[in-house]
Amino acid sequence: MHAFRNLLALLLLTLCAALPLSAQDEGEDLGSTEGALFLLLPVGAKAVSLGRAMTPLDGPESAFWNPAGLVAVRESQVVLLRGDPLAGTSTAFSVLWAHPGLGTLGVSYQLLDIGSQAITDIDGNELGSLSVRDHLGVVSAAAQLLESVRLGVNLKIVQFRRSCRGICPDAGTTATTYAFDAGLQILPSERLRIGAMLAHVGPRYQVLNADQADPLPARARLAVAYNLISLLTDDEELGGWLSVEVQDRLLNPGSLSLYLGTELTAGVAEAIFLRAGYVLGDLDQEDGARVGLGFRYERFDLSIAKSLAVSTLTGETEPVHVTFSIRF
C-alpha cells in the first residue's frame, strides 16, 4: 500500500515540476493557438452520453478523464472504445489491473485517424498517399488515500504523425511531447461526489520548429455529482446521478464550458444504464444534447452513445460511440 502511494506521490511531484515551465511558456503568448486539440475530443460512450461531465464519476473510461475514478474499478479488465468524431476515426483501448486495498494501474492507447490523401502528378497519376494520425499513450495510477478521498494521475505521450507512402513532396512530419493529468475525488457521503482535476499539462507542442510550437490545451475542471434517487428510496440497486461540471483554460481563463450529465441505473452485478447529457458553451464541441445506453451482464459491459448536436460544418450529427469491456 505504501509503495503504491509513494508511486503516486512521485508522479505528482513530477507534474508539479512541469507546471512552472508550462506556465511560463504559455504565458508568453496567451493568444497563441493551442496544439494537440484532439486531446479535447471525448473518448468513450459513457463520457459522450453524459456530456463530458465525468470528473466526479468513476469507471474504466476514467483512464481518459479523471484518473481518480479508476479507484472504483474492482476487477481487472480490458476496455475497447470506438467513435467517429468530426476530426476522424477514434480507436482506443485500456488494460486495467485492479488491486483491492491498493488501487488501480492502467495502460491505454488511442489512435485518431484523420485520413489519407492521394498524391498525384499533373496528369492525374497516383504517386503515393499522405496520411495524418494522432497517437496518445497513457499510463494511469489511482489509489484511495483516505476513506473518502481518491487520487489519480496520468502520464501521457502525445504524438502527431504525417507519413507518406510512395513518392511525396516531403518525407513526412513527426511531433512528440508529454503531458500529465492529476485528479481528485472527494466522497463526503454515499450520495455526494466532488471532483477536480488538471488535464493536459505539459510543454509546448512543436510540429515544425520551436518558434511555431503551440501550448497544449491545458484545462482545469471542477464538478459535483449527486444521487437524486437516494432521496426517494434506499434501494441500493437503483441510482439516479446528476453531474454538473465546469471547465476552463488553465492558464488563460475566461472561456467557461458547462457540462451536464444524468445517469439512471437499475441493478448492480447485472445492470442497465440510461444516460443523457448536455454541452453548453464548449469552444471545442458543438452545443447540444447527448444520449446513451449501458448494459452489464456477467463479465461484460457495453455502452452506446449518440450525440444529437448538429455540426455547423457538416450539418450532420456524429455516428454512434461504443465502449465494450471484459473483466478477468
Feature map (PLM): residue ranges:
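Bacterial N-terminal signal peptides that target proteins for export
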Residues: M1-L8
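Bacterial N-terminal signal peptides
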Residues: A9-A18
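Sec/Tat signal peptide C-region and signal peptidase I cleavage site
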Residues: L19-A23
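Outer-membrane beta-barrel porins/channels
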Residues: Q24-V48, L57, E75-Q77, S90-F328
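Short strand-turn segments of transmembrane beta-barrel domains in outer membranes
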Residues: R52-M54, S76-L86
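N-terminal periplasmic accessory domains that precede
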Residues: E61-A72
